[in-house]
């Protein structure tokens, strides 16, 4: 598999490893990005890859609670300018109301729902908005929590929309707890909510990486396989702390020093009740959507070639 300079740059952004080592990793793995990350880790050159995929799409990742129903939704626009207009934000907020009240099964079903305060469908309203704002707009995804207690958090004007769902006992107000957990999610972007949810395949993969790392370490290479496996198993706790929300160090150390799970239990106890983390939704604006990147040099070369004909 061939790879490009952009692939080398992306691997560097994911791993914080130098360009030349990233190039070697891609050469050794035939351009496979995931295998290249593992190759660098096994050589001791990189830690687990950051979730640093370039996000270029504009719009808003939004979360709210409507009549007790938690809603997270992402709506994309062509430019950041359009996303910051009152008209666009009103659209997003009303779409969240539709999701909460009409419970559409998917995006297509949402488009067919009646828009609040009108007899028009969501599709018809969006067509009007496209004409008035002058940009294409798309509903990308949404989710809802109709049960338990939901707490919403929107970071930096809609770059992150986080919805946390909690089981609350004792009649306490868990809003602050939920908000602090949501801020943790936005800041640390955990891959899993709890270590019990990590697929066995991922656990096995991490074990293999740790064993390979020891095989490449002159001080560890000669140790028996069973010893390496025990050491690797011990390192899984570090993996869980890096990747699992409830096992992560709570970022607000001014409030609590320990894990997120410990913070939730401690904060609830101080309020005279009990709170259990149930689920969460974390939308990052434009996550996974790649905009076309213009190659200015290639564009100029093409224009010169065209002019020469």
Protein language model regions, located:
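N-terminal assembly/interaction segments in proteins that build large macromolecular machines
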Residues: 2-309
